[in-house]
Amino acid sequence: MAFSRGVSPGGALLRTSRMFSLPPVIPPPPGNKLQMISERASATEAYPTHQVLTTFESSRSRGDWGLKRPLPLKSTTGTTYPMVKVKEMDSLEQITDFTSGTQHGLTLKKFQALNIPISTPSEISDPSRLFRPVQRSVFEADTDVTAFSPDEQIQEAEKRWKFSGPWLAGMTPGEFKEYLAKTVRPKRAEFRKFIQKKIAAQKTEAANRELQETAALRGDAVAETQEPFKPESITDDEVTEYLRRLRNDNQVLYDLVGQFLDLAPLKPPQAAEARQHSLLVNLRATDSPYGGRGPPITHPSAGISYLRTAAYLNNHPIYGPQKSHPPVQARVLKPRRGGLGNDAKIGVAGFVADGPLGTSHSNLRGNSVMDKFDPSIEGGAKLWVNVDKATVDSTGRVQLTVSDAKATDVLIAKELIGDAREPIFGSAPKRQEKTFKKIPMTAARLRGRYENSDSPSSPTMSGSSGYGLR
């Protein structure tokens, strides 16, 4: 006979408390069929899906990780960094299913060592341009807000990052048809009521504008105000006629549908793409940073950094304040090849980034570090770079923008880690002693030096001719 064991009130409280429970698992990133590496089981995921746990060294030696049961020492004490991810607290075998969490745990530590903030993405893809947009933090007070009133939700659409509706440009044809059938079509009646409110507001605004113009012609100081029209006063024929007029105004129609369904901003297509999408030709450009790639699936910072700015100075103990931040070493993962789309790929703090662009040192012709792969280099080829910007794209992946580091900054960084082979400003010049050439003393010179002063070879006193008297 099966029976259920009773749980104490304290145990039930701990089980239901969010403070003493692991957060739910985040869905994994969608796989791309064109990139088979994302389908491999050994590949590192784009972002962590499980909570990473750590413990003290004294507790790890006992297998105590703060869980329901201790973890085996053989698989947890052999690693340098104590980090695990719990997949399942109680499996079918009544054990705790866990795996190593150093993949994302060390990546987080490496990224936080860079001390750079997360910025909103920009549409400028060429960092070598002279004009660079000002980096805007994702934690600004006017953008890092999710609770909006209905009016603010419409006014702040260009600054928001969270929407209840989808991003239409990122949907497949099948997903779009399913969205129309299950979400849009059942809301026809609600949309007509929404249009009634818009018509009532427009009629009220037009009436007030007419009253103000009439008062201005009469010379009245104060104009009368029209009582707001009620949405119930708008007939179905007016709604139908208004919808017919909207068919010829793509921008107004898209704005109203986007406000009603709370759709993410959509960037208009380019001139070449506009021919295939004739309905999107007249759409105006959006100022939203997520119009081109879509809003992020998480918070724009992804929880990887909470810094708001990089406006600080590094103070060197010997050389004083530095103009730029310390550079970091990057590993060349893929050398540069000739042709479009074959740029070099480098690894920075656990992330893959594009190589420095423009006329930089690493792009000079004949630079063997970026041009070819040399397997004889221990640990792989490396170069020093500066991390200029970090963003999180719509799929939750961290994108880094790097540039070549200055030679002086590289020497200072090498000196701090004891790898500088030569002084930064060169060795101090040695003090040059004033030397005199020694001339050998001959017998004649000795006789002339010690010659008797009573019989000089030349007169010791000048005559009157020496003073110009003769």
Curated annotation (Swiss-Prot):
Pfam family, one: Mit_ribos_Mrp51
Compartments where located: Mitochondrion
Annotated region (Disordered), positions in chain: 436-470
InterPro entries (alphabetical): Rbsml_bS1m-like (IPR016712)
Cytoplasm among keywords: no
Gene it is expressed from: mrp51
Identification of the protein by name: Small ribosomal subunit protein bS1m
Lineage of the organism: Eukaryota, Fungi, Dikarya, Ascomycota, Pezizomycotina
Keywords: Mitochondrion
Superkingdom of source: Eukaryota
GO BP, sorted A to Z: mitochondrial translational initiation
Bias (Low complexity) ranges: 453-464
Family that this chain belongs to: Belongs to the bacterial ribosomal protein bS1 family.
Entry annotated with the keyword Mitochondrion: yes
Entry's Gene Ontology cellular component terms: mitochondrial small ribosomal subunit
Stated role: Component of the mitochondrial ribosome (mitoribosome), a dedicated translation machinery responsible for the synthesis of mitochondrial genome-encoded proteins, including at least some of the essential transmembrane subunits of the mitochondrial respiratory chain. The mitoribosomes are attached to the mitochondrial inner membrane and translation products are cotranslationally integrated into the membrane.
The protein's assembly and partners: Component of the mitochondrial small ribosomal subunit (mt-SSU). Mature N.crassa 74S mitochondrial ribosomes consist of a small (37S) and a large (54S) subunit. The 37S small subunit contains a 16S ribosomal RNA (16S mt-rRNA) and 32 different proteins. The 54S large subunit contains a 23S rRNA (23S mt-rRNA) and 42 different proteins.
Molecular function per GO: structural constituent of ribosome
